[in-house]
A protein has these predicted regions:
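N-terminal leader/linker segments that initiate helical-solenoid repeat arrays
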Residues: 8-83, 330, 342
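Alpha-helical solenoid scaffolds that mediate protein-protein interactions
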Residues: 72, 109, 145, 181, ...
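Terminal, low-structured helical/coil segments at or just beyond the last alpha-helical repeat
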Residues: 20, 25-28, 40, 290-342
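Hydrophobic face of amphipathic alpha-helices that form TPR/SEL1-like repeat modules
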Residues: 49-56, 68-72, 82-91, 118-127, ...
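Bacterial N-terminal signal peptides
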Residues: 1-6
Length: 342
């Protein structure tokens, strides 16, 4: 589970030429279990001595890591070793999975100022592991970790300020937090901060800075940023116009499953914008984006006017994608139906 805060910036309907996609400030992708989101430093907390416990952890030697970290935590009161022990217990690596013991080690490390432990406890509190769910407590722990420079905590806390439920909505403070995470190389934060610059929310409107941030996130395979960067490249907005590179980024995002990119790529291929027109591939991507919920009447009309052979080929090429999308939608609907009432 991750934070569910989502800030949507309304955009226009898709047209026959690439437009701005629906922009979202979204949580990072994937689950946010502490093992995935809590970086544990590879050096000791009291010097530059290599951390053998963390080295063993990285190599998958979890029992060895547990023994070394335990010794270091007890002998040196090293907070990073305590956090590593929390990781091992939280995820059942080398020891039986035990949220209670994980939380105990995280608390000891957090009390000694380790931001990774603070963030891990924030996720525990958010998910109700080793205690009741408490978003307020989670937010406070994230704030504590963010103050110490934890990039993912800064990113998640920024989303809470954008959401405006636990805290008063504050785009300016959100931008400051996103900058911490973006400067640390977090692509979701780079994309989110770029969106704020593009919209002029919490920061002066600056398309060049927005595109710069989109480009950084796009290079790190953030699909939404790839779409934004591709649109900027295609239109020459905030960056030199380069339609061929734009098409490459649209295609990359489309292949990753982004329906906006799929729809824009279909438009480009249907009209031959910057590339040779390819009606069959255009129809394929339109069928895929339509299955994912994208509305585009001009493209639908384009597909309907294809000759039967070309349309059949497009349908055959799109079918694996469409089937996968439909299975995912059905599974999500089933999960919503099975969820207990709040």
């Amino acid at each position: 589970m991750t934070l569910t805060a989502v800030f949507a910036v309304a955009q226009g309907q898709p047209a026959t030429t690439p437009q701005h996609p629906q922009s979202k400030l979204v949580p990072r992708k994937g689950s946010a279990t502490p093992a995935q989101t809590t970086p544990v430093a590879a050096t000791a907390g009291n010097g530059n001595e290599p951390d053998l416990a963390f080295g063993a952890f990285q190599r998958g030697r979890y029992i060895t890591a547990f023994g070394l970290a335990t010794q270091r935590a007890l002998d040196r009161k090293d907070p990073k070793s305590m956090t590593l022990l929390g990781e091992l217990y939280a995820n059942g690596l080398g020891v039986p999975q035990d949220d209670k013991k994980a939380a105990e080690w995280y608390h000891l490390a957090a009390a000694r100022g380790d931001p990774s432990a603070m963030f891990a406890l924030a996720i525990f509190s958010l998910e109700g592991r080793a205690g009741p769910r408490d978003r307020q407590k989670s937010a406070q722990l994230m704030a504590d970790a963010a103050k110490l420079g934890h990039p993912i905590a800064a990113y998640d806390l920024a989303l809470l300020y954008i959401e405006g439920q636990l805290f008063p909505q504050d785009f300016s403070h959100a931008a400051e937090l996103l900058r911490v995470a973006a400067n640390a190389g977090n692509p979701q934060a780079q994309y989110a901060l770029g969106t704020l610059y593009k919209e002029g929310r919490g920061v002066p409107k600056d398309l060049h800075e927005a595109v710069r941030l989109f480009s950084l996130a796009a290079l790190a395979d953030e699909a939404d940023a790839q779409v934004e960067y591709a649109i900027a490249l295609f239109n020459g907005a905030g960056v030199d116009r380069n339609q061929q590179l734009a098409v490459a980024y649209f295609r990359k995002a489309a292949l990753s499953g982004n329906p906006i990119a799929q729809d824009r790529l279909a438009t480009i291929l249907a009209n031959g914008f910057g590339v040779k027109a390819n009606p069959v591939e255009a129809a394929k991507w339109r069928l895929i984006s339509k299955a994912a919920g994208e509305t585009d009447l001009p493209l639908d009309e384009f597909v309907s006017k294809l000759d039967p052979k070309s349309r059949a080929q497009a349908e055959d090429e799109a079918r694996p994608w469409v089937d996968s999308i439909q299975r995912t939608l059905a599974a999500n609907e089933h999960a919503r139906g099975a969820a207990p009432a709040k």
